[in-house]
Amino acid sequence: MGRIDTLLGDITQVKADAIVIHDLPTQDPVHEITIIPRGMAGGMTISLPQEDRAYQSRQELEERIAVCLGGRVAEQLVLGDVSTGASSDIQKASAIARAMVTKYGMSEKLGTIAYGNESDEVFIGRTMAQARSYSEEVAGLIDEEVKTIVDRAYARCEEILSQCRKELELTAQYLLVHETMSGAEFSKVFTDPESEEFLALPSAT
């Protein structure tokens, strides 16, 4: 993969996160979008909390999963292929969904029950089955519920990004030129897309 392909992949994933965040009511607003590499990340979307939260609702968690899946969905929609770039976000999405089912009692099928406990970890000499405190049948149901939650979030993310292709393109054009976009500039993608700063941009394609 060449540098241009890598750059387009980074832009696709970063801008997608921002677009999804913008469309979801429980998520903190976008403060900054950048494609400048930071650590292992090729770029990032930064959100600033509007208030301190001690707890998170089911809606907040489901919408957070949708945000995590933004990069993967955008790769498929925009580039027509997927890469390993979204792997950490997919792991986060899966972990949130599993916690909803096994820790937070947010599964309709499995009910308000915590499955396993903090000591249910696999140590040397112990298999996963030995460490687990519930049956194979329950384990299968947990996997099904996790998949249902992730699939539902994926579908919602796909719907948002499909409806916001123009905003995706405009954000990409801006990032290709400037590399970093403030929250105020990003908001104008939705409120004032015909402003001079956007009309002067070259096409990203």
Task: Kindly label every feature range from the protein language model.
Residues 24-205:
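Soluble catalytic regions of large protease machineries
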